[in-house]
Amino acid sequence: MKKYLLVLFLFAAIAVVAQDKLVISHGPYLQHLGETGVTIIWTTNKNAVSWVELAPNDQTEFYLKERPKYYSAEYGFKDVSTVNTIRLSNLTRGTTYRYRIYSQEVLSHEGTKVQYGTVAASDVYRAKPLKFSTTDQSKEKKISFVVVNDIHGHNDLLENLLNKGGYKSADFIIFNGDMVSEMQSEEQMFGSFMDTAISMFASEKPMYYARGNHETRGNFANAFPQYFKSPSGKLYYLLRRGPICFVVLDCGEDKPDSDIEYSGIVAFDQYRDTETDWLRKALKSPVFTDAPFKVVILHMPPFGGWHGEDEMATKFVPLFNEAKVDLMLCGHLHKYIHQKPGNGVDFPVIVNSNTTVVKAKADAESLNLKIINEKGEQVDLIQLKK
C-alpha cells in the first residue's frame, strides 16, 4: 500500500511539474508584414521575456553562429508577458529570412533582482527554421490573395475554404471578420480559428484582418488589438500590395449602441465618426491615390437595413464614391451577393458567403476574383480592367 501511494505521489508530482513548465501555447504568427519590417506574435502559458533570433536564408546551419536577437521591449525595458509581440525593423526589402522564437520564464522580480526559469523555443534542429519574406513594392507587379469570412469558429470549414482557394500559392490571406461568434478568452479565440491558421500558413505567410461585429462581443473583445497589428496602429488602415491599395476598415457593431445586447458598454457610432475622419485623410494619401486598383475590405456591406449597415452607407460610401474606389469586399450576410454599381454606390460590392472563398489575382491592368464554394465549384467570376 505504501509503495502504491508513493508511486501515485510521484506521478502526481510529475504531472504538477509538467503543468508548471513554460511552453509556447500558441503561435508564432506574422502580422504587419511590410517592406522593411514584420511583427511576430506568440503566447506562453506563463509570464516571460521573449526574443527572436534572425538569420539570412542561406545554406548555413542555424546553429553555425550566434544569431542577432530582437527582444520584445518598450521604453528600454524587456516586456514580461504571456502575449509576446516583437517588431523586427530595418530589414531589407524583398528578402527572405529564417527565424526562431524564444521565451524565458520570469519567476520573480524584486527590486533589481530578477529570477529566471526555463526557456522555451521553436525547433530548428528536427524541423526547418520558420521563414518569412519582406515585400518590395518596386518589384511586386503581380499579387494573389485569398479572402474568407464568417467562419464563426468552424475550423473544418476554414481549412476546406483555404484549400479550395489555393492558399498555398497565394501571397497573403485576408480574414474579413466574424472568424469567431464572440471573444470569450485567449484559448477560445485561438481554438476557434487562429490555431488552424497558424498550422496552415500564418507562421510564414502574412494574414491581414478586418474586424467584424462578432469580434466586438464577449468579455475578451477588448483584447483583440493585442493580437492583431496593423501599419496604422489602429484596427483600420491602408495596405499597399502590388497594384492594389486595400482600405481595411473596422465596421463595429450592427445594432444601435443603446441596444440591450450591449449592456451600455459600447460607443461604436462615435468610434466610426473617428474612423471616418481618418478615412477622409487616408484617401488623399499617395499610398491610395497612386495605386492602379483601390479595394475596400469591410465586413458589413453598405446595405441590408440594419443600423451598422446604414452607418457604412452614410459615413463611408460618399468618401469612396469621391475617391473612385474600384471594389468593396464584404461578408456578414452569410450569403453570396454580387451587387453592381447603383443606388448611391458607384462601385461593385461583393458580399462573400460564409461557405465561399474569394481567390484573387491582380496586375496593373486587371483584377480577377473567382468565387469558389465548399465543393470547389466556381460560382462567380469578377473581372475588372484598367
Task: Locate predicted features.
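Alpha/beta-hydrolase fold active-site loops
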Residues: K142-I143, D171, Y236, P243-I244, ...
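Active-site-proximal segments of metal-dependent phosphoesterases and phosphodiesterases across multiple
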Residues: Y262, F268, P286-M328
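Conserved, compact domain cores that house catalytic/ligand-binding motifs in diverse enzymes
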Residues: E140-N219
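Bacterial Sec-dependent N-terminal signal peptides
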Residues: M1-L22
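Extended active-site neighborhood of metal-dependent phosphoesterases/phosphodiesterases
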Residues: Y102-K131, Q188-K284, K315-N321, I337-I371
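Active-site neighborhood of phospho(di)ester-bond hydrolases with catalytic His/Asp-centered motifs
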Residues: V146-N149, F172-D178, K205-N213, V295-H299, ...
